[in-house]
């Protein structure tokens, strides 16, 4: 069985939130591993918006599948392989029914979007 999640985010919204709440926003939404990448590479709002959209899309796919009743954004890590391709890691949560979890992220200076496929 396959489930999908999709999300679109206005980059300006994430930029405003990041400027207002900086560390509080990062700590509420992103895992320690993701925050370290943000700080190391000094990533901007476009990057954060893509990661945020991917988390939201992942959450939608997981919730629609019924294998979880709730999941926090911090539990959904959006990381990158060495070649830059994004992937989803559930930050230590083991869901035995998950066969595959794919994510695609795209963005412009105005919008970021993500599409997730969850296979059970």
Question: Where are the model-predicted features located?
Answer:
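Core catalytic alpha/beta fold that binds nucleotide/phospho-ligands
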Residues: 1-120
């Amino acid at each position: 069985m396959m489930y999908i999640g999709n999300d679109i985010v206005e980059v300006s919204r994430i930029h405003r939130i990041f400027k207002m709440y900086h560390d509080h926003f990062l700590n509420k939404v992103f895992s320690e591993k993701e925050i370290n990448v943000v700080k190391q590479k000094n990533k901007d709002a476009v990057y954060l918006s893509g990661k945020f959209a991917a988390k939201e899309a992942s959450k939608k796919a997981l919730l629609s599948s019924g294998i979880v009743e709730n999941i926090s954004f911090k539990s959904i890590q959006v990381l990158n392989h060495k070649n830059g391709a994004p992937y989803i890691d559930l930050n230590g949560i083991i869901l035995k029914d998950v066969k595959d979890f794919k994510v695609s992220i795209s963005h412009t200076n105005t919008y970021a979007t993500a599409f997730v496929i969850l296979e059970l």
